[in-house]
């Protein structure tokens, strides 16, 4: 079992739309991108998260269908929000390491001090753009449509 499988299992079982709305495709391993797209399409079409059973019927791709059956078979007790944080942390760490590796390989010996500092700042800004570091202030799900009597 991996974190992505556990996360998707919990989100779908608990119908946790709040966690799902904070999920980005790039937080998940590439093997899960097709499944992410299918779940997202279902949400846009029906305005709700699919169940695992819905996905078993809707998806025809064998690889993705096998992934759904594997996700369905696991037993998870962790909260979706916590699992999402783990996914974001893992993604962020990989991005930082990849960016620093690229920086060391291509720039470090050719830049002066100011250029090096600016390059490192740019790496931080790029990663901040890719990862939501703060929780959204308001969710449309929490805004009441009508005022209480």
Where do the protein language model's features map onto the residues?
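Non-catalytic interaction/clamp surfaces of large macromolecular machines
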Residues: 105-127
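The Walker A/P-loop phosphate-binding site
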Residues: 125-149
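A charged, amphipathic interaction segment
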Residues: 82-113
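Charge-rich, solvent-exposed alpha-helical interaction surfaces
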Residues: 38, 42, 58, 70, ...
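Short, flexible coil/linker elements and helix-boundary hinge sites characteristic
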Residues: 47, 56, 71-74, 101, ...
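Noncatalytic partner-interaction/assembly domains of nucleic-acid and motor enzyme complexes
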Residues: 1-90
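Intrinsically disordered or highly flexible coil/loop and linker segments, enriched in small
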Residues: 16-17, 45-48, 93-96, 109, ...
């Amino acid at each position: 079992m991996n974190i992505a499988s556990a996360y998707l299992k919990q989100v779908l079982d608990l119908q946790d739309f709040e966690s799902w709305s904070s999920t980005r495709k790039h937080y998940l391993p590439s093997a899960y991108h097709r499944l992410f797209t299918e779940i997202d399409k279902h949400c846009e079409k029906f305005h709700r998260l699919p169940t695992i059973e819905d996905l078993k019927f809707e998806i025809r791709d064998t690889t993705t269908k096998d992934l759904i059956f594997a996700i369905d078979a696991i037993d998870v007790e962790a909260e979706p929000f916590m699992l999402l944080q783990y996914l974001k942390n893992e993604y962020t760490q990989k991005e930082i390491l990849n960016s620093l590796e690229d920086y060391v390989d291509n720039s470090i010996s050719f830049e002066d001090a100011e250029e090096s500092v600016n390059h490192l700042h740019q790496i931080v800004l790029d990663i901040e753009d890719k990862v939501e570091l703060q929780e959204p202030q308001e969710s449309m799900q929490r805004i009441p449509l009508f005022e209480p009597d």
